[in-house]
C-alpha cells in the first residue's frame, strides 16, 4: 500500500534527453541492461564505503549482489540490488532531474543530425533513463540503507513528461527496477537473451550478477527455478593482464565511464615495492562535450584495498590530463580517506607523479607506434594537452614532444608537425624554432611576416589556438633551441641572414630622410620607424619588441577581462616595394601623410585583424582611389 503520493513533471532537459536518447540509441538498445547493472554495481560500492564507518547499514546482509528476473507472460524484466538505495528526496533528484552543469545549453546546441549520434548522447552517462528505450513504463521500488521499512519509495513513469512518487513499505534494502517492456521488445524477457547480454557487457564487474534460471533434471525436464551466478564476479583490474581480452578491457571502460564508444587505448599496471597499487588508465576516443566546462567532473575512481572510496578523485591527475578515465586501487591509503586528506598527502603526491608519468609514456608510445591514431587523439584532446607546459614544469619536455602544430611546409591547417620533426628539418646554421601566432590558420598562413621565411625556405610553425600564446610563454625552448616568434622587430636570423646586408645598408642611407619624415608624422603613435628587408610582396608591417606583449597575448588578456598594457608597434617599411618608393618621392605633405597613414592602417589590419577606426580607413581608401 502506498501513501503520500504525488505526480511531478520531469525537468525540461530530462524530457528532451529522453526523446533524443530513445531515437539515437535504439539501434544499440541492449545497452540498457549494461547501464542498469552498472548503476547497481555503483550502489553496492557506495554501501561498502559507508559501511566502513557504519557497519549497521548492512542490516545483517553483507552479501551484495545484482539479481535479474523476468516474467515472459507479463512482459517484464526486473533488476534488483541490495546496495545503498535511495530516499524520497534522492529519487526526485536523481530520477527527475539532470544536475549536470551546461546540460540545457548542450541540448539546445544539438542539431537534428547530431541528435542521431549515439556516441554524442552516450557521453551523458544516460544510465537509468536508457530503460525507456525498451520499456513503455518503468517502476522503481527503493529503500535507503538505514531507513525504516515504511520509509521506502515507489517511483513510476511512462517517460512522457511526468512521474509519480509515493511512500511504500519495502523489507529489503536497495533498489528494484521493473521494466514493462514494449510489445516489440519482449525478447528481453527471455533468459538466454539476458544471459547473452550480461556475458557481453557485464562479465567483468566485481559484483555477482544472478539470474532466476530454470532447473532441469537429467532427462531435460524442468524441475524448478533457482538463482544462478552468471558472471565472473571478480574485479577486472585485480586479474592478470594476460588473461584479460581487449574486448573485456573495452567493456569495462564502458561500465566505468558510461561512454558508448570504445576507448582509444589503455594501460593496466600493478606496482609493488615502496608503493603498492594497481592502476587501469584509459584514453577515450572522443572528448566529452563539457570538457572545457569549469564544473566538468574528472578524475579517477579510487579504491583502497579493493574497497570503493570515491568517484572523480581529481587529485591523482594534473588538470591537463583531465580527459583520462580509469581507476586506482591503493594499498597505502587509509580506508577512511577523504578528499581533504588526499589534498595534502605524500602517498597521493607520489601516486599522482607516477600516474602522470605513466599517462605521458602511453601517449608517447602511441605517437611513435601509430601516428594516425595519435593524430586522432590530438584532434580530440590537443587543446587540453597544451595546458601542460604552464602546469607541469617537471614534465615540460615530455609534454612538448607530444605537441603538434600546423606548418608553413604543409598546405593544410591540420596540426601534424611535432617539435622533433621541425628540429630534424632545420636548415644548416638555423639556431631557433620559428613560429607565428594569429587568430586563424588563414591569417597565420598569409601573414606578411612569413615572406622572408618563404623566400629562404625556412619552416615556420603556424599557431592559431587561443591557448598557444599562453603556452609559449612557458615553453620557450626545446632540445636546446629557442622558440622564437617571427613577428618581433629585432628578429635575429643569425647565420641565415642575407649575405647582401652591406648592400642593403648602403641602400638604407638613401631612405634616411624619408624615415625621419615618417617619424615626425607619426610621433608617439609608434615606438619606432625603420626600414626592413624581410618583406618581398608587402609594403609595410608592424612588429613588437622582445620585451613587449605580443598582439595575440594582448587579445588573450582582453578576452579574459584583464587590464592590457598599451602595445606600441615598430612600423617597418619595405624600401624595395614600389609603393614605398612612390610615397618617398611625394613632396606634398597632405598626400604624403595620407599614403603613410594608409600603409600603417594596412599593416595594423594585417597584424591585429581589426582597426580602431575602420570608417576612417575606408574613407581614406576611397579618397585615394578617387
Curated annotation (Swiss-Prot):
Compartments, record wording: Cytoplasm
Region of interest: B: 340-555
Subunit and interaction comment: Homodimer.
Record-level Gene Ontology MF annotations: ATP binding; ATP hydrolysis activity; ATP-dependent protein folding chaperone; unfolded protein binding
UniProt feature coiled coil, ranges: none
Protein's UniProt name: Chaperone protein HtpG
Key word ATP-binding present: yes
Region (A): 1-339
Family stated for the protein in its record: Belongs to the heat shock protein 90 family.
Xref: InterPro entries: HATPase_C_sf (IPR036890), Heat_shock_protein_90_CS (IPR019805), HSP90_C (IPR037196), Hsp90_fam (IPR001404), Hsp90_N (IPR020575), Ribosomal_Su5_D2-typ_SF (IPR020568)
Pfam annotation, one family: HATPase_c_3
Species, as recorded: Histophilus somni (strain 2336)
Top-rank lineage group of the source organism: Bacteria
Keyword list, A-Z: ATP-binding, Chaperone, Cytoplasm, Nucleotide-binding, Stress response
Amino acid at each position: 500500500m502506498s501513501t503520500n503520493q504525488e505526480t511531478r513533471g520531469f525537468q525540461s532537459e530530462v524530457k528532451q534527453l529522453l526523446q533524443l536518447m530513445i531515437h539515437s540509441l535504439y539501434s544499440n538498445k541492449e545497452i540498457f541492461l549494461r547501464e542498469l547493472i552498472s548503476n547497481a554495481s555503483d550502489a553496492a560500492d557506495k554501501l561498502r564505503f559507508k559501511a566502513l564507518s557504519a557497519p549497521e547499514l548492512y542490516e545483517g546482509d553483507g552479501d551484495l549482489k545484482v539479481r535479474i528476473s523476468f516474467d515472459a507472460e507479463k512482459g517484464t524484466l526486473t533488476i534488483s540490488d541490495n546496495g545503498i538505495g535511495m530516499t524520497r528526496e534522492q529519487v526526485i533528484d536523481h530520477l527527475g532531474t539532470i544536475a549536470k552543469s551546461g546540460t540545457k545549453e548542450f541540448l539546445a546546441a544539438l542539431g537534428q543530425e547530431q541528435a542521431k549520434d549515439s556516441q554524442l548522447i552516450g557521453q551523458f552517462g544516460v544510465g537509468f533513463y536508457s530503460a525507456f528505450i525498451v520499456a513503455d513504463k518503468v517502476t522503481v521500488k527503493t529503500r535507503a540503507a538505514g531507513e525504516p521499512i515504511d520509509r521506502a519509495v515507489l517511483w513510476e513513469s511512462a517517460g512522457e513528461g511526468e512521474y509519480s512518487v509515493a511512500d511504500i513499505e519495502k523489507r529489503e534494502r536497495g533498489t528494484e527496477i521493473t521494466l514493462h517492456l514494449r510489445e516489440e521488445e519482449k525478447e528481453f524477457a527471455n533468459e538466454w537473451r539476458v544471459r547473452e547480454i550480461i556475458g557481453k557487457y557485464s562479465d567483468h564487474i566485481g559484483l555477482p550478477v544472478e539470474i532466476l534460471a530454470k532447473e532441469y533434471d537429467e532427462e531435460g525436464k524442468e524441475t524448478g527455478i533457482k538463482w544462478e551466478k552468471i558472471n565472473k564476479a571478480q574485479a577486472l583490474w585485480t586479474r592478470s593482464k594476460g588473461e584479460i581480452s581487449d574486448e573485456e578491457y573495452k567493456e569495462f571502460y564502458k561500465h566505468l565511464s558510461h561512454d558508448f564508444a570504445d576507448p582509444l587505448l589503455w594501460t593496466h599496471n600493478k606496482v609493488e615495492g615502496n608503493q603498492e597499487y594497481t592502476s587501469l588508465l584509459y584514453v577515450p576516443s572522443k572528448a566529452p562535450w563539457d570538457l572545457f566546462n569549469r564544473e566538468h567532473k574528472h578524475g579517477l575512481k579510487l579504491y583502497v584495498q579493493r574497497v570503493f572510496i570515491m568517484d572523480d578523485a581529481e587529485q591523482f591527475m594534473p588538470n591537463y590530463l583531465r580527459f583520462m578515465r580509469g581507476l586506482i586501487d591503493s594499498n597505502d591509503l587509509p580506508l577512511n580517506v577523504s578528499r581533504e586528506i588526499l589534498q595534502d598527502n605524500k602517498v597521493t603526491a607520489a601516486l599522482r607523479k607516477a600516474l602522470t608519468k605513466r599517462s605521458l609514456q602511453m601517449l608517447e608510445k602511441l605517437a611513435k607506434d601509430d601516428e594516425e591514431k595519435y593524430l586522432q587523439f590530438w584532434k580530440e584532446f590537443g587543446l587540453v594537452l597544451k595546458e601542460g607546459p604552464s602546469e607541469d614544469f617537471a614534465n615540460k619536455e615530455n609534454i612538448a614532444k607530444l605537441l603538434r602544430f600546423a606548418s608553413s611546409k604543409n598546405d593544410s591547417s591540420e596540426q601534424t608537425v611535432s617539435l622533433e620533426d621541425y628540429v630534424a628539418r632545420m636548415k644548416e646554421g638555423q639556431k631557433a624554432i620559428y613560429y607565428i601566432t594569429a587568430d586563424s590558420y588563414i591569417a597565420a598562413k598569409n601573414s606578411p611576416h612569413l615572406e622572408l621565411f618563404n623566400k629562404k625556405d625556412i619552416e615556420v610553425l603556424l599557431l592559431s589556438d587561443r591557448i598557444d600564446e599562453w603556452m609559449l610563454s612557458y615553453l620557450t625552448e626545446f632540445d636546446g633551441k629557442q622558440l622564437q616568434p617571427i613577428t618581433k622587430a629585432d628578429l635575429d636570423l643569425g647565420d641565415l641572414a642575407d649575405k647582401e646586408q652591406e648592400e642593403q645598408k648602403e641602400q638604407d642611407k638613401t631612405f634616411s630622410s624619408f624615415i625621419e619624415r615618417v617619424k615626425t608624422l607619426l610621433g608617439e603613435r609608434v615606438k619606432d620607424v625603420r626600414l626592413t628587408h624581410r618583406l618581398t610582396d608587402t609594403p609595410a608591417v608592424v612588429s613588437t619588441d622582445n620585451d613587449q606583449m605580443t598582439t595575440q597575448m594582448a587579445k588573450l588578456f582582453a578576452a579574459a577581462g584583464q587590464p592590457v598594457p598599451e602595445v606600441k608597434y615598430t612600423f617597418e617599411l619595405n624600401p624595395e616595394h614600389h609603393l614605398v618608393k612612390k610615397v618617398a618621392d611625394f613632396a606634398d605633405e597632405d598626400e604624403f601623410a595620407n599614403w603613410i597613414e594608409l600603409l600603417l592602417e594596412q599593416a595594423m589590419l594585417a597584424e591585429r585583424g581589426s582597426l580602431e577606426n575602420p570608417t576612417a580607413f575606408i574613407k581614406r581608401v576611397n579618397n585615394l582611389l578617387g
